[in-house]
Amino acid sequence: MLKIWIVGRGRMGGAVEAEIAACEDLALAGASEYVPEADSIGAADVIIDFSHPNNTCAVCERAARDGTALVLGTTGLGDAHRQCIVRAAQKAPVVHSANFSTGIAIFERLLAEMRGVSHLFDIEVVEAHHRYKQDAPSGTAKLLLAAIDPENERERIYGRGGMGARGNEIGVHSIRGGTVAGEHSVLFLGEDEVLEIRHSAASRRIFARGALTAARFAAGKAPGLYSMQDVLWGGKDA
């Protein structure tokens, strides 16, 4: 039975805990708001972190110290956090994603397939989340932007205002309100036609289930940095 430690006692942490309770092959080793100093976390096979960027480097250091598999879903990360993740991946298997839903992983793959024809369209990204989400644009929006334009060949325009002609750009728009679990759309706007790819999350359960799929994948893997693409399509010698 795979033993999971959850870091982060918020909405996502609670959703992961509920899903663990429904799985016969998983057990909750413990849960904490921050990385506990006690050795109890050492009993875990996998750490799942949905806490806060201020916690990310400490979580990475703990996983690296013990060689414990880490599933990292915290968003709003900066370059310093990403350096911590890369260092941890030298000592432990780390699955890092801004979104653990299967649908978003497929979405990302579809966008990568669109790169060869993306120059034929203007592109806009629209995302919506609940009123409590702090970072904007969402980590998932950034993930989708990287999938369609990995070399940053188009300027990102965050929101629109004022006057001026459209340039070589991708518009990015964030909506915050209510209890929206997460909605993401990428619009390809061409001459006399519009193609829209859209994903809507009905609840946080899809992210929790995806994180547990990632945990099963990471357990026993060699140290390295993995993505949901690796988890679902068997990358890095899966």
Predicted regions and their residues:
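Structural motif
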Residues: 7, 50-51, 73-74, 97, ...
